[in-house]
Amino acid sequence: MDVRPLHHPSLEDITVEGILHALSDPVRVAIYADIVAQECSHNCSMFLNISDKAIPKSTLSQHFRALREAGLIRGERRGVEMYNTSRCAEIERRFPGLLRAIVNAHAIQSKDEAQARKLAGKRSSRRSVKNN
């Protein structure tokens, strides 16, 4: 079986622009925030449902590739499975505070969005009660 090696940029080749581009996608930032929070390697299939949305495996693979090529994660093949870990500690040395700020901002935004969905659900249930 011919398996191509995964590309992991050296720390010196990681750029702020590359990081910001990789994390500009809501699915990728959610994946990355989860990997950082768990501090252990994750099998790609753990992310088939992000933010209550089903994601096809092929799309998920592309998201992981973007994160890996930006230098945010390190991928490791174990048999047929791929496990990913954060390179947060390495990047922190190069760009102190950058990833922490992004992950914290994502957490605030996610909390606000969850509250808005909850509030919208209450409003719609009140409307259906009024209509009955």
Where are these regions (language model features)?
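Conserved acidic functional residues
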Residues: 25, 63, 96
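Short amphipathic alpha-helical segments, especially helix-boundary/capping motifs
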Residues: 4-9, 20-23, 38-40, 64-66
